[in-house]
Amino acid sequence: MFSEIAPRYDLLNRLLSFGADLRWRRRAVDLALEKAPKRILDLATGTGDLALMLKERAPGAEVVGADFAPPMLAIARRKAEARGLEVRFLEADALALPFPDGAFDAVTIAFGFRNFADYEKALGELYRVLAPGGRLVVLEFPPPPKGAFGLVYRVYFQRVLPFLGGLISGNFGAYRYLPESVEAFPAPEALKAMMAAAGFSVRYELLTFGVAAIHVGDRP
């Protein structure tokens, strides 16, 4: 599914979020770089947007982008080459990461965590590959907020977005999956508890009236 929508993935992210995803990603980068990490993993990197932002902001850091979809990675590599950025992109399974213990000082995930088949197992792997004192930053769509804004947002997210996304990408199934996966995703407090159970010290912030959320987990 993700491989099929790769060619228009970036365009759709910008259009369907009205450009807000770039602001959210920049905030995630700010939080990831607070501790001046030297080794950074961007997991579920997709076409590499966040990995490239990290490298631009921290040119002296080693940045690795990992994803399970080769077509996404191919686009990420082309983008890195075009921008003259040295980022290593590789294929990897989030539930069995091909890295030694403590390999990274920071791990970021933007809009990929909810696609993992086993959240607890993924968090265990993320904790394992982080060095002591390392930081995990998870940018995700929580379930839609309540109230009047939430009602309008649900109509857009469940009706308009799947139609437009399917029309532009040619894959209606992928953009029907998006709202379904968001509705099934843990609420911010539940994800915080899940990360804490994995050993992280956790805080989170809501963005754009709760449309997106960033969870920050520090490994002791």
From Swiss-Prot:
GO terms for molecular function: demethylmenaquinone methyltransferase activity. Pathway: Quinol/quinone metabolism; menaquinone biosynthesis; menaquinol from 1,4-dihydroxy-2-naphthoate: step 2/2. Keywords: Menaquinone biosynthesis, Methyltransferase, S-adenosyl-L-methionine, Transferase. Its EC number is 2.1.1.163. GO terms for biological process: menaquinone biosynthetic process; methylation. Gene3D superfamilies: Vaccinia Virus protein VP39. S-adenosyl-L-methionine binds at residues 47, 67, 93-94. The keyword Cell division does not apply. The keyword Transferase applies. It is an enzyme of class 2 (transferase). Pfam families: Ubie_methyltran. It catalyses: a 2-demethylmenaquinol + S-adenosyl-L-methionine = a menaquinol + S-adenosyl-L-homocysteine + H(+). It comes from the Bacteria. InterPro entries: SAM-dependent_MTases_sf, UbiE/COQ5_MeTrFase, UbiE/COQ5_MeTrFase_CS. Methyltransferase required for the conversion of demethylmenaquinol (DMKH2) to menaquinol (MKH2). Belongs to the class I-like SAM-binding methyltransferase superfamily. MenG/UbiE family. This is Demethylmenaquinone methyltransferase. It comes from Thermus thermophilus (strain ATCC BAA-163 / DSM 7039 / HB27). The lineage of its organism: Bacteria, Thermotogati, Deinococcota, Deinococci, Thermales.
